[in-house]
């Protein structure tokens, strides 16, 4: 029997600390297989993503569309589902809400990276982008790092204030701004989670800064200024979520950096890489393995 979960039910199955812990476990699981994802361009500028992954117990496929033109229209930019199958029987076990899985697993990856790499994990936290990913990162860092103070930056003051108000209802101190670059000086933690249609962060980080950039996942997308990326590479450390970032990380590729030279989150978890001195940039592009980790948590 297939259990079909809506967005709220999917969210309840995926607490952020458990997700981050499962991702760390997955990175050391030799049974995990993640074939290359299929990204098919759609008329009008959207994309169709087909993202399979499996381990010894379950197999999943995330089937979603990304429609950037929906931003600001009231329609979701990400729509679709995650189907979870039992490897032994071939039966379908779960149907999860795709946008909810995507938002929560992306934020949990950033959380895991911050737990392992952030020089100053106490905050305040700057969130650049006030959409679904902004909310997910707010919740993840509050639950997983105990952040109590944050700044929300968006081109729209109203959008920034709405997310800041949501943070206040969760007991956090929060303020809204339209100037992310000015706010960065006060925040050792930062996440950029925008549609990645233009540079949103140019200011250089603090010496104890950690920036997770999650919005850009193709070579043509960008959130961070090239000079900022090169600053991290020269005076700090750059990490990527997976080696696939070598052909997906638009921020780093447009900065002229050799992305294949950067350590991955798996290297960090397995102990072959560490942050060291200086500011840290974590570039996340997405991977079906993260969706598999979410499915592993959801089926428990």
Question: Whereabouts are the PLM-identified features?
Answer:
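Glycine-rich Rossmann-fold phosphate-binding loop(s) that bind the pyrophosphate
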Residues: 130-131
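C-terminal helix-to-coil terminal segments
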Residues: 274-300
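Rossmann-fold NAD(P)-binding glycine/threonine-rich loop
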Residues: 214-271
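Short helix-loop-beta connector
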Residues: 117-124, 146, 207
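NAD(P)-binding Rossmann-fold cofactor-contacting core
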Residues: 144-170
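Rossmann-fold NAD(P) dinucleotide-binding segment
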Residues: 181-182, 186-189, 196-210, 223-226
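N-terminal ligand-binding/catalytic initiation module
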Residues: 1-103, 111, 118-121, 288-292, ...
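Short, conserved loop/helix-junction motifs that constitute active-site signature segments
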Residues: 144-146, 203-208, 228-234
């Amino acid at each position: 029997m297939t259990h079909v979960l809506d967005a709220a039910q999917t969210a309840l199955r995926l607490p952020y600390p458990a997700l981050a812990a499962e991702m760390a476990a997955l990175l050391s699981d030799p049974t995990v297989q993640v074939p290359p994802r299929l990204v098919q361009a759609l008329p009008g500028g959207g994309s169709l993503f087909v993202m399979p992954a499996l381990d010894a117990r379950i197999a999943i496929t995330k089937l979603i569309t990304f429609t950037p033109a929906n931003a600001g229209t009231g329609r979701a930019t990400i729509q679709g589902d995650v189907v979870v199958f039992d490897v032994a029987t071939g039966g379908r076990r779960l149907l999860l809400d795709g946008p909810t899985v995507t938002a929560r697993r992306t934020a949990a990856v950033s959380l895991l990276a911050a737990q392992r790499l952030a020089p100053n994990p106490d905050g305040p936290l700057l969130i650049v982008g006030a959409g679904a990913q902004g909310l997910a990162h707010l919740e993840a860092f509050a639950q997983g790092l105990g952040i109590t103070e944050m700044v929300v930056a968006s081109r729209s003051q109203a959008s920034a204030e709405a997310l800041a108000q949501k943070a206040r209802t969760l007991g956090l101190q929060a303020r809204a701004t339209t100037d992310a670059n000015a706010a960065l000086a006060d925040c050792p933690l930062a996440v950029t989670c925008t549609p990645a249609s233009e540079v949103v962060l140019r200011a250089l980080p603090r010496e104890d800064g950690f920036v997770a950039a999650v919005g850009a996942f193709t070579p043509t997308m960008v959130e961070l200024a090239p000079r900022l990326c090169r600053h991290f590479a020269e005076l700090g450390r750059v990490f990527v979520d997976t080696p696939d970032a070598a052909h997906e990380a638009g921020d780093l590729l447009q900065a002229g950096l050799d992305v294949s030279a950067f350590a991955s989150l798996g290297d960090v978890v397995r102990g072959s890489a560490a942050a060291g001195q200086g500011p840290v940039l974590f570039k996340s592009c997405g991977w079906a393995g993260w969706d598999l980790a979410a499915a592993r948590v959801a089926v428990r």
